Amino acid sequence: MASNSTKSFLADAGYGEQELDANSALMELDKGLRSGKLGEQCEAVVRFPRLFQKYPFPILINSAFLKLADVFRVGNNFLRLCVLKVTQQSEKHLEKILNVDEFVKRVFSVIHSNDPVARAITLRMLGSLASIIPERKNAHHSIRQSLDSHDNVEVEAAVFAAANFSAQSKDFAVGICNKISEMIQGLATPVDLKLKLIPILQHMHHDALLASSARQLLQQLVTSYPSTKMVIVSLHTFTLLAASSLVDTPKQIQLLLQYLKNDPRKAVKRLAVQDLKLLASKTPHTWSKENIQALCECALHTPYDSLKLGMLSVLSTLSGTIAIKHYFSVVPGNVGSSPRSSDLVKLAQECCYHSNRGIAAHGVRVLTNITVSCQEKDLLSLEQDAVFGLESLLVLCSQDDSPGAQSTVKSALSCMVKLAKGRPHLSRSVVDTLLTQLHSSQDAARILMCHCLAAIAMQLPVLGDGMLGDLVELYKVIGRSATDKQQELLVSLATVIFVASQKALSAEVKAVIKQQLESVSSGWTVYRIARQASRMGNHDMARELYQSLLTQVASEHFYFWLNSLKEFSHAEQCLTGLQEDSFSSALSCIAESLKFYHKGIASLTAASTPLNPLSFQCEFVKLRIDLLQAFSQLICTCNSLKTSPPPAIATTIAMTLGNDLQRCGRISNQMKQSMEEFRSLASRYRDLYQASFDADSATLRNVELQQQSCLLIAHAIEALVLDPESASFQEYGSTGAAHADSEYERRMMSVYSRVLEEVESLNRKYAPVSYMHTACLCNAIIALLKVPLSFQRYFFQKLQSTSIKLALSPSPRSPAEPIAVQNNQQLALKVEGVVQHGSKPGLFRRVQSVCLNVSSTLQSKSGQDYKIPIDSMTNEMEQRVEPHNDYFSTQFLLNFAVLGTHSITVESSVRDANGIVWKTGPRTTMFVKSLEDPYSQQIRLQQQAQQPLQPQPLPQPQPRSAYTRF
C-alpha cells in the first residue's frame, strides 16, 4: 500500500534532492577523464548526459563540452565514439555551448587524421553539431570532400553529415544538391550508396525552387530506376519532401494512388499505403473527392487483406477530418452523391462484418464518422449499420484476451462514445449492448467497457438510473480472485456505479461494494475506489473507506494524508443534512463541518514534505474553510435583521446623511463587508487557478465553479441589498446554458440559474431590505452547499509536472550579500532559466513562452536625505522569451541612481499555446548596493571641506508682540 500510493500524490517530485553542487560534480568527472585507465575514462564520458540533466545551465555545459572536445582530440577511436554518443544524447543542450569556435576547432582537428575511421567519427560528430554550426564552410567542404572517399565507412559518415546539414542550412542544401544528383545518376556509384543518398533530398525544402529541382530529380529516379528498392526509397523521399515543403502535395497523392493502382509489386503498394496514411494525417485538406474515390475503388477490388487493412486505415483517418465533408459536399451545378449510395459507405458496410477484426474496426470507424459528421435526416440505415457493426465487433473481440483483440475493443468503444455523443437517440441501444456484453466478456474487455459506460453516463446522465441495477448485480459476482485485472475491474465498475448514482448511494449498493472490498481487494484498490467516491461526491462512502485504510499504511506521512481525506469527507458529509428555509440548522451544520475541516487541514499539513509540499491541496482546503466561514457569517448577518431591525429613525438618518442604505440599519455595513469578503475569496480562487498549470481541465473547472459561487453570492448581495437600482443581470444570464461535462458542474449550473432567477424576481418586486431578501440569500447558500463538493483528480494525482529553474548573473557569494554597483552605471542582469518536466511533459498544456518580471525597490538609503523622484527609486521591467529545447535567457538593464541597498525581485510566469498566463513562479530575490562613483565622491568631499570656511549668516531678530512672553 505504501509503495503504490507514492504514485498518486508524490509523483514527479524529484527535483529537490541534496547532491553535489555543479562544480564538484564536474571535477569528479574531470578526474575520471584524466585517468590513465581507458575504462575509467569511458565511464566518466558516459556519465556526462546525467550531469547535463541535473545542471542544465550554460556555464557548466560549456566547460563540460570543452573537456569532451579535448578527449575527442587526443583520445582513441573508442573514446571518440563515446563522446559522439554523448553529443547525440545531449542534442538539446548543444546551443548552450558558449565557446562554439573553440569547441569546433578541437573537434575539427581530427578531420586531418590519416585514419579513415577517425575521420568518419569526426564527420558524424560534425553532423550531430549541425544545429549550432549550420554555416561553417570548412565543415561543408570536408563533407563534400569525404563523399568522394574510397573508404565506405567515411562515405557513410559523410552521407549522415550531409543529411543533417541539409536540414539546417539552405546554402549547404543548394550547394550539395547537384553533387548528390551526379552521384545518384553516376554509373560508378554503388546501388546501396545511391539508396543512402536519395533520402538526403527530403531536406531540400528551404525554398520553392530547390524543392522543385529535388522533385524533378526524384521523378527521374522513379522513372529511370524501376527496381523495387529504388522505387520504394524514391517514393518515400518524394512524400517526405512534399509533406515538408507543402508544395505539390495533391500531385504526390495522385502519384501514390497511381502506384497503388497500377504497380503489381506488393511491397510498392504497401509503401504507397503508408505514405498515403502520412499525408492523410498531415494534410487532409489537400485530398480531393476524386482521390478518396480512387482509394475506395482500390480497396474494393484488392484481393489482399493486408492492403485492404492499410487502405481502410487511410480512409478512417480521413473520415475524421474535413476531407469527409469535401467528399459528400454538393458542388454548384452538379448533383452531390448521397452518403448512402457512395462507394465509401459501400466499402465500410462490406468491411463491418469482415473476418479480419482490424478491417472490421476501421469499417465501423468510417461509418461512425460519416454518421456523426453528415447531419442529414435520412441516415437511419447508416446509423443502424454503425450500431450493428459495433455490436458484432464487440461480441467478436470481447471473448479474446489477446492484445490485438483488446486494441480492437478499445477502438470500437471509442466509436460508441462518439456515436452516443453525436447521435443521442442511439445511446440507449449502445448502453443495452454494453450491459449485455459485460456479463460474458473477459476481464480486460470489461474494464474498457466500464470506462465507456462511465463516459456515456457523464454525457447523458438520464441513462444512469437504467444501468444501475445491472451494474450492482454484476458487482456481486466479480472479484472472486485477487488478480490485477480483477482489482482493476473492481475500481472501474465502482466508478460506473458512482457515476450512474446521480444522488447519494443507497444502503444496498454501499453494502454490496463494501462486502466485495472486504473479501478480496487490496489496500490500493480500496484507496482508488475511495478516491473515485470523493470525486463523485459520495463522501459518506469515501469516509468509511479512508477509515478502513488508516491502519494499513507503513508511513507516517501516508497516515496523515489518509486521515486528512477522512476528515474532509466527514466535513462534507455534515453538509448533506441542510434543508431549505432551515437557517439555524444550517449554521450548526456548517459549524460541524468546519470542525472536521480544521482537523483535516492539520493532518494535511503534517502529511506534506519538503519534496512534496501539497501546496494545491492545502490552498484548496483553506479556501473551502474560508468560504464556509463566509457563508456562516452571511447567514448570521441575515438573521440579525430579526434580532436587530432598523431603528424607527433609520429613514431620517438616511435622508440626513444622503445614504439610502442607512434605511436598513446596521445590516447594510455588514452586508458590504460580506460582499467584499466574497469578492476577495473569488480573487483567491482565481490566483489558485492561475497557479495550477499542471492541473487537468476537470480540476480547473472545479476551481472555476468555486470562484463563480463566490461571485454569485457577492452579486446577489449587491442586487438585493446594496445597489438594487444598478444591478445588471445580463452578464450572468448565459451561465446555465453552458455545456456541462460532469454531474457536479451540471448541478452547480442549475443552482446558479435558479438563484439568479429568484434574485432578479425579488429585485424587481420589492425594495430592500426585507425578510424575503435575507431568506433568498440564505437559501442560495444552502442550495450551493447541498451540491456535494467534488475533489477532482489533481487533488490526488499529479499526472503532469512542470517547474522553472532560474539562474541570475552576476550572482552574489552568499544570498544575503549585496552586489556592488556604482550609481552612475547600469547593472546588466542576465536571467537564464530551464523548464523542467516530469514523466509526461505537455499532457494537458505546454509552455509556449516564459514571462519574466523584474522589479527593484529601495530598502535602505545612504547619503543625504533629500526628496528623490519615485522613478529613480524603483525599476519595473517585463520581457517574454520563448524557450528553445527547454532553455531561455534574456537580459535587463537596471538603473540604481539612488545610493543605498536595493532588492531585485525576478518572478517568472508561463504562457501556454492558448495565450493564458499561469503564475507558476519561481520568485527569486537578490540585493544590490548602489555606491557613489569616485569622481562624484571627490567633488562632494571638496564641497564639504569648503563649507566651514564660509561665514554663517546671523539670525534675524524676531518682532516682539504681546504673545512673545507667553
UniProtKB/Swiss-Prot annotation:
The chain residues annotated with the modification Phosphoserine are S338, S809
Q: Which UniProt keywords apply?
A: Chromosome, Cytoplasm, DNA damage, Nucleus, Phosphoprotein
Q: Does the keyword Transit peptide apply?
A: no
Cleavable signal peptide? none
* Location of this chain's protein in the cell: Nucleus; Chromosome; Cytoplasm
The GO annotation for biological process reads: DNA damage response; RNA polymerase II transcription initiation surveillance; snRNA processing
Q: Which Pfam families match?
A: INTS7_C, INTS7_HB, INTS7_N
The terms describing its cellular component in GO are: chromosome; cytoplasm; INTAC complex; integrator complex; nucleus
User: Region Disordered: which residues?
Assistant: 941-966
Family under the similarity heading: Belongs to the Integrator subunit 7 family.
| Record text on subunit structure and interactions | Component of the Integrator complex, composed of core subunits INTS1, INTS2, INTS3, INTS4, INTS5, INTS6, INTS7, INTS8, INTS9/RC74, INTS10, INTS11/CPSF3L, INTS12, INTS13, INTS14 and INTS15. The core complex associates with protein phosphatase 2A subunits PPP2CA and PPP2R1A, to form the Integrator-PP2A (INTAC) complex. Interacts with NABP2.
Its biological purpose is as follows: Component of the integrator complex, a multiprotein complex that terminates RNA polymerase II (Pol II) transcription in the promoter-proximal region of genes.
Listed name of the protein: Integrator complex subunit 7
Q: Which organism is it from?
A: Mus musculus (Mouse)
Q: Which gene encodes it?
A: Ints7
